[in-house]
Amino acid sequence: MEKFIKLIKDKLGDKVTLVFDKKYLSDYVGAIQGKADVLVKAETTDDVAAALKLAYENDINIVIRGAGTNLVASTVPEGGLVLDVSNLKEIGQIDEFNQSIEVGCGVKLCDLQNFVESKGWFYPPDPAEKEATIGGNISTNAGGMRAVKYGVTRDYVRELEFVTPQGNVLKFGADTIKDSSGLNLKHLVIGSEGTLGVVTKARLKLIPKPAYTQSALIAFTSLRKALDALPTLFAMSLKPTAIEFVERKVIAIGENYLSKEFPCPEAEAYLIVTFDGSEQDVLDAFNIA
């Protein structure tokens, strides 16, 4: 390990340190503590490529780390190298003609969404953890509540810059709606959770920002009636943006914790339904629902 640390320090200089910050040894839950021998804080794709190449040649374990919001210990190292890619956080200009934007893997989802929405655009994937990085979203094919209408991360990745374990930098995909030339390796990488290499950049599809969004709480006297309502909602001309099912047992826990009563206390189940679109379309949808 001493030989490897010297090699990687010679290559990457002060971007290489020992692991003093305990956040690199755990995940967001903090229940499991790992161990690591060295930390690389990459700032460019070349840094990532150099670190991966040296680790591969010297048979060193690697854990890739973005925002560290993972809840299942997959970012907990078991010795070797922690490669922090959170500094690859450049947000490019919006390509309005192709309706896309290029971002670094370290860009936080919330920062991307705030940026594009301030320009009148919309990036739909909406997993629960908004502080997660785009690289993490791609590696896990994150979805979220809006997947009901808009799909998951995979549906919004046009192009990927990807570094293999051997340190080769590859590009997959194209900034087009349809690309049927060759093997679709982009989709092999998406959802692979870092097992095939490291995503360093991505060009993401955007859509125009919906003009109006509204949610409603619908109460039901039984769980069965709530579930039976779902086909009707999905058959509507304006598809729901998100649907969340909540049963009375869960509500009771929240009421006890917050010391507040939920609306319609006699209900056994609830659907929280969100629609987006033009204001009139959304209002019409709620009238039908």
Task: Annotate each PLM feature.
Residues 1-289:
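Noncatalytic alpha-helical scaffold of FAD-dependent oxidoreductases
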